[in-house]
């Protein structure tokens, strides 16, 4: 399988309605502990899938499977229809060029300034230096940090580091963004700023995403708000509206206990789910 997932092939598959992400009866365990048990779900183009569940339920492991950092024991993980299990390491590297990732820890290079951190992926792809600079400025402007371009991570607050991480994730205009607890460890005001940027990326760029959060408030804010480009920030959808492209996946003890819409989750009759979201 050569030149897997080049831009043209990816665009063709998106146009045909191929799911961006598909887990098909995925199981994964470490030694005798089964972490994920028969996980199946699909994520369509333009959809935001919010992944909820108690700590230790397998959420972060699921995210690593979606990026090919782990492979399942059984079942299949597909990105745009391509099976990750069938890829060589080179092909997995090519696949990751279509995936942006935002970690809770930000995972910035402390020895590089903001510009070089954001530019890192494009430099690895040998993009023209002038184009790299222009795209870095564009990405930093998106997260409202263009004035921090020459600063180093040690000079940034936790929230600013997280915003740089988002800029780095979006600079290659990926088909999929994986947000692993992007507001973890942040205060409520800073968390709201990060969610504002996630909603902005969803509504302005239409990027497909998986997002893990431990904050139910963040999840339901995303589902009930939209980004207003004229105002420059997100706003509540009028008349109790709900974003149609935001759906939920809830894991508990390694199993999918809910896969559906915001309304379906809000009106669930399942006792465990009702207690979890209350």
Residue positions per predicted region:
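Short coil-to-helix segment of the ABC ATPase nucleotide-binding domain corresponding to the Q-loop/switch region
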Residues: 112-119
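Catalytic Walker B motif of ABC-type/P-loop ATPase nucleotide-binding domains
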Residues: 177-180
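Conserved ABC ATPase "signature" region
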Residues: 82-83, 123, 130-148
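Conserved signature/switch motifs of ABC ATPase nucleotide-binding domains
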Residues: 151-154, 172
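Helix-to-loop junction immediately C-terminal to a conserved catalytic motif
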Residues: 67
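Helical segment within the ABC ATPase nucleotide-binding domain
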Residues: 192-205, 224-226, 237-240
């Amino acid at each position: 399988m050569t030149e897997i997932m080049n831009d043209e092939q990816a665009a063709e598959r998106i146009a045909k309605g191929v799911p961006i992400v598909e887990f098909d009866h995925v199981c994964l365990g470490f030694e005798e502990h089964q972490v994920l048990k028969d996980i199946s779900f699909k994520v369509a183009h333009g959809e935001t899938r919010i992944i909820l569940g108690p700590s230790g339920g397998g959420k972060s492991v699921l995210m690593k499977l979606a990026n090919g950092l782990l492979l399942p024991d059984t079942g299949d993980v597909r990105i745009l229809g391509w099976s990750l299990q069938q890829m060589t390491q080179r092909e997995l590297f090519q696949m990751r060029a279509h995936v942006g990732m935002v970690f809770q820890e930000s995972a910035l290079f402390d020895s590089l300034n903001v510009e070089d951190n954001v530019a890192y992926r494009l430099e690895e792809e040998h993009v023209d230096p002038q184009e790299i600079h222009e795209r870095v400025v564009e990405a930093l402007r998106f997260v409202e940090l263009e004035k921090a371009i020459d600063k180093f991570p040690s000079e940034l607050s936790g929230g600013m580091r997280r915003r740089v991480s988002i800029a780095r994730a979006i600079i290659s205009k990926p088909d999929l963004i994986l947000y692993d607890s992007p507001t973890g460890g942040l205060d409520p005001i800073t968390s709201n700023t990060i969610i504002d940027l996630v909603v902005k990326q969803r509504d302005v760029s239409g990027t497909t995403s998986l997002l893990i959060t431990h904050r139910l408030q963040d999840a339901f804010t995303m589902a009930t708000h939209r980004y207003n480009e004229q105002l420059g920030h997100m706003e509540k959808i009028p008349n109790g509206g709900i974003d149609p492209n935001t759906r939920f996946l809830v894991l508990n003890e390694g199993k999918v206990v809910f896969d559906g819409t915001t309304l379906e989750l809000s009106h669930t009759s399942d006792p465990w789910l009702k207690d979890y979201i209350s």
